[in-house]
Amino acid sequence: MIALIQRVTRASVTVEDEVTGEIGPGLLVLLGVEKDDDEQKANRLCERVLGYRIFSDADGKMNLNVQQAGGSVLVVSQFTLAADTDRGMRPGFSKGAAPDRAEALYDYFVERCRQQEMNTQTGRFAADMQVSLVNDGPVTFWLQV
């Protein structure tokens, strides 16, 4: 399971001219689900995403996680993160989970975030989405479990 996380001052996702999720300061989480992923990996990745200390403390040091910084989380499914880009000029998607399994694990990940009392907004699974963000820093990390 893969999370591309970006520290943002604001982010939103729109589907068919409807805003489905919007946050102020916090994390935009682009989530990719691979074939061998399961609930255990989703739990671990959620723990890492919410615990990752990439927000500045009073001394300007990256020492706070999103909850400590008072931020929110916007989770957007992105199957292209599971692409095989090792060769050729076209990505392959054989590493990605089947859509029904990927959606179940995406929903599970979102619910785990909410269970941590995290303000968690979402996109719409498998939809054509427009994602807007202001990357703060820029600060972007690839987390994989």
Curated annotation (Swiss-Prot):
A GO term for molecular function: Gly-tRNA(Ala) deacylase activity
Main location: cytoplasm
Motif (Gly-cisPro motif, important for rejection of L-amino acids): 137-138
Tree of life domain: Bacteria
EC number in record: 3.1.1.96
Catalytic activity: glycyl-tRNA(Ala) + H2O = tRNA(Ala) + glycine + H(+); a D-aminoacyl-tRNA + H2O = a tRNA + a D-alpha-amino acid + H(+)
Any GO BP: D-amino acid catabolic process
GO cellular component, one term: cytoplasm
Localization annotation: Cytoplasm
Keywords associated with the record: Cytoplasm, Hydrolase, RNA-binding, tRNA-binding
Domain remark text: A Gly-cisPro motif from one monomer fits into the active site of the other monomer to allow specific chiral rejection of L-amino acids.
Matching PANTHER family: D-AMINOACYL-TRNA DEACYLASE 1, D-TYROSYL-TRNA TYR DEACYLASE
Function field: An aminoacyl-tRNA editing enzyme that deacylates mischarged D-aminoacyl-tRNAs. Also deacylates mischarged glycyl-tRNA(Ala), protecting cells against glycine mischarging by AlaRS. Acts via tRNA-based rather than protein-based catalysis; rejects L-amino acids rather than detecting D-amino acids in the active site. By recycling D-aminoacyl-tRNA to D-amino acids and free tRNA molecules, this enzyme counteracts the toxicity associated with the formation of D-aminoacyl-tRNA entities in vivo and helps enforce protein L-homochirality.
Description of how the protein assembles with itself and partners: Homodimer.
Family: Belongs to the DTD family.
Protein name as catalogued: D-aminoacyl-tRNA deacylase
Organism: Enterobacter sp. (strain 638)
Gene from which this protein is expressed: dtd
